[in-house]
Every structure is written in structure tokens, then in C-alpha cells.
Amino acid sequence: MAKEIFFSDEARNRLYEGVRKLNDAVKVTMGPRGRNVLVQKSFGAPAITKDGVSVAKEIELKDALENMGAGLVKEVASKTNDEAGDGTTTATVLAHSIFKEGLRNITAGANPVEVKRGMDKQAAAIIAELKNLSRKVTDKKEIAQVATISANSDSAIGGLIADAMEKVGKDGVITVEEAKSIQDELNVVEGMQFDRGYLSPYFITNAEKMQVELQSPYILLFDKKITNLKDLLPVLEQIQKTGKPLLIIAEDIEGEALATLVVNKLRGVLNISAVKAPGFGDRRKAMLEDIAILTGGEVVSEELGRTLESATLSDLGQASSVIIDKDNTTIVNGAGEKSAIDARIIQIKAQIAETTSDYDKEKLQERLAKLSGGVAVIKVGAATETEMKEKKDRVDDALSATKAAVEEGIVIGGGAAFIKAGAKVDLNLSGDEAIGADIVRRALTAPLRQIAENAGFDAGVVANSVSVSKDDNYGFNAATGEYVDMFKAGIIDPVKVERIALQNAVSVASLLLTTEATISELKEDKPMPAMPDMSGMGGMGGMGGMM
């Protein structure tokens, strides 16, 4: 396959054309009055979205060089979404503005490497200033405001997320699912829940709900299979004397052991239930240890020289109640010591910070939530499947933005924070470095300009009004067309989202500006294959005689 090579200004201009097309499609979604984008799907109904990263992911351009430019900015949107969960449109608009302004200066003779150095210095200074302008999220109202802004001014979604975060805490897990009705719902699971149900329906105590309900049970934790009844007998005899229920959590329980437990349950000798341990391999061992710490018990493990026969009541955990259905087990109010649980939480947080695997990080965060607060499930309802998907995207964005706000704090929203931070930075650079710094400073108005433009206002007038004001909280409410104190109006953005959007935008724009050559595949126009020779088929008329 032949390759096509472009150099210098020609290469950068072709790359810019791809960035411009991507930006034009994404930028219309920005702000409270942003517009929808309709996306054709290979099958089914078209998708309607106001989510910047969803729009960006759908864009593939015919020209290979333009597609390379668009692809790099798509990566910015995707990376911003992965790290901050929101701010994808902001990052795209910033990257386009920086690249456009930088291209003009480099075409006029500026040194790309010096320009890049100035851009990096300016971005670092602005991020530091954003942190100075930020404030901590202090109450449920501010959480609701952040979520509402990120959900495209949907206050119902904002309130739902604030309720969920209040109930499970900042370390709790909040998941988003599709509801079976048109109503939004919030379900909160208190205590630790894991996805293992009862091993036999004969353990059920509440036939109406098809659940096992154990009050103040002992909890036996074993990391191997239990098949032999005699191994269990000593601990069962001790439990019978107490008159309390027993929950057994083990790798598996089968054969004679399970049959005998069921018989004892049916005869009323013991109030007992059994479930499989959650997870697999090393993760199973870690989760059993989590349950042990939460309930104040110990894992009976042959690796530690313990056998099931040696288990005593002091090895067993306890909880105020346990509820088991066919799919899940929930342990409420474990009897573990708070200091031990806190130490375990610190240990898991350290593992989250160290791991590089997204899958491992997700599983560790689930374990952290189960230990620290619980799990909230937001069920999103809508009249049609298309509306459901669009709404679910907005809830996911709002949830990520809220977590980012709790993590690093908030600044004024609507693109005004960038302008206020930029006004406070004066690096006193010279030469082409100063040009690079000025490129970033100019680009900082782009998000506010776009928000104003989408709302039908004069972008230049709005940007100038915010720039000249000395009030750090002064900004433009695009929903009403008024200039307001942004904190008081509840128009706020997470610092983390602004920081990551700017970092990623400067990073990709500087890469594009320092590109001196591009290599892409040359599409060759292949001639249509010739039609086969049909001349020999003339005699087929005589085939009628075959009848």
C-alpha cells in the first residue's frame, strides 16, 4: 500500500480541518441551551444525544489526514471522560481554540517548540489559580447543583444524585440502571451486599418475599468446599446451644453436608442458611477477609493451619440481621470493630492508588463501598428506549461530575472560572514562549463564548463583560441571560473537570502544533472488475428440448 506524506503547514492545515469538523459537531451540545445531535445507527432507531464524548466517538472522516486530526481530539474527549467523567465538550472546544490560534502564529513564523513550552507553563499556572479560586463542597445543596448543571440543568436528576450520595457517603458505590417504568427511582442497600444467593430454597424463612431472614445470626467463614458433615458437627453443636441462627459462607457446600443442613432446617433443629463466597481466586479470599472484619469474625483457613473442625464461637462473626434472596446476600450492621474496619478501608484505598488496571480498580472500589457505606442504585425511567439511553448518559455524566466535585472542590461554572483564573496569571515570559502563553489565555474564553452562542447571545459581549469584572464570582447565566454571582445562583463546576479538560486540551493541541510531517495511506481508485464474457451462453435457448 502506497503512503502519502505531507510536510509543515500543509500537514498541519489538513489536520486542523479534521479538528474543526469534529469541534463543529460537538460544540453545539454545550451549555444549558445546548442543542441535540442526531446520530445514525447501523441498526435500530437513531440516537439523540447531548453528550459530547458520545458525539465525538461517532465521527469518522473520509479524508485520512483530517481523520487523524479528529482522532487525536477524540482521544482528548475520551481521556477527559475516563479521568473526570465530564468536561468532554469543554476539552474539545479548548483544544480546537488553542490549535487554531497556535496554527496562525506558527504559520506566521513562531517556533513551535518555544510556543509549546509557553503553553505548558501558562496551563500549569492557570490550574494552580483554579485551585486557589475553588471551595470545598460542604452540603447536599451544592452536590445537587453540580449534578443538575452536568445533567443539562435537569434538577430532578440533580436531586436524585444528591440523595444517593447523602445516603451512601462519598466512598459509597452509586450505580445507574434502566427502570422498568417511566419513573426515576432510588434504591439504597444498607450494609454489605454481595451477589450470591441461598444454596437451597429450603432455607427460605419468608415465603411471601422468597427470602431468608436471619436475626442476630452467627456467621461462619470458610475458604474451601464443605462436603463432609463431620467437619461441621462441632460448630453446629455449639450453635444449637446458643439458640441463634447460623449463616455459613464457604467456597461451596454440597453432598452430605448440604443435605443434612436442609434436613435440620426443615425439622426446626437449627435455623441455618448457606451461601457461596463471593468472587474468585485471590479476590474471593480478600472479600472473605472483608466480611470477617465487618462482622468481627475470622476466616477459618487451612492455609493458616486451621480446620473446620477446630472452629469455635469466637471465630464466628455476628450481625444484627442477614437477608438472602436467590441472587444476593445482605449483611446489615456487622459487629466488627470500627478501628479494624477503618484500617481495612485505608488499606483498600492504598491498593486503588497503586493499581494500573481499570478492572482491578473497579473491583477494589466496590469492596471499599461495601465496607464504608453501602450501595445506591439509581433507576432511570423514560417513555422510549431512545430517551432512556440519552437520559442514562446524562445521569452517568452528572454522577461522575459530582464525585469529582466532592474529591477536589468546585469553582464558578459556565466557563467563567477559566477567564477569572487567566486574568490572575502573569508569567512575564518573552519571545515565542510569551506567544504560547497568550494563545492559551485567549483560548480560555472559548467555552464561555460557545455557551453564550448556543443560548442565542452575542458571545463577544458576554465574554468581555465577564473579563472586565473584578468580582471573582461574577459570570453569565445562559439559561436566563443574566449576569449573576455564580456560586449564589448554583452555577458551579468541579475543579477536577476543569483541570483535566485544560491539561488534555493543551497536551493534544501542542502535539498537533509541533507536528512537522504526516504519513497516511494513499487510497487508490481500484477499477471496477470487468463483466464476465457472456457470449458463450447464447445457445442456452436450446435447453428447452431437455423437457
From Swiss-Prot:
Q: Which GO terms describe its biological process?
A: protein refolding
EC number annotated for this UniProt entry = 5.6.1.7
Residues annotated for ATP binding in this entry: 29-32, 50, 86-90, 414, 477-479, 493
Among CDD domains, the record links this protein to: GroEL (cd03344)
Superkingdom to which the source organism belongs: Bacteria
Catalyses:
ATP + H2O + a folded polypeptide = ADP + phosphate + an unfolded polypeptide
Checking Pfam families in the record gives: Cpn60_TCP1 (PF00118)
Q: Does the keyword Nucleotide-binding apply?
A: yes
Gene Ontology cellular component annotations, sorted alphabetically = cytoplasm
Q: Which UniProt keywords apply?
A: ATP-binding, Chaperone, Cytoplasm, Isomerase, Nucleotide-binding
Q: Where in the cell is it found?
A: Cytoplasm
Q: Which GO terms describe its molecular function?
A: ATP binding; ATP-dependent protein folding chaperone; isomerase activity; unfolded protein binding
HAMAP family, A to Z: CH60
Q: Which PANTHER family does the entry link to?
A: 60 KDA HEAT SHOCK PROTEIN, MITOCHONDRIAL
Sequence similarity: Belongs to the chaperonin (HSP60) family.
The protein's job, in short, is: Together with its co-chaperonin GroES, plays an essential role in assisting protein folding. The GroEL-GroES system forms a nano-cage that allows encapsulation of the non-native substrate proteins and provides a physical environment optimized to promote and accelerate protein folding.
Give the multimer and partner information: Forms a cylinder of 14 subunits composed of two heptameric rings stacked back-to-back. Interacts with the co-chaperonin GroES.
In its UniProt entry, what is this protein called? Chaperonin GroEL
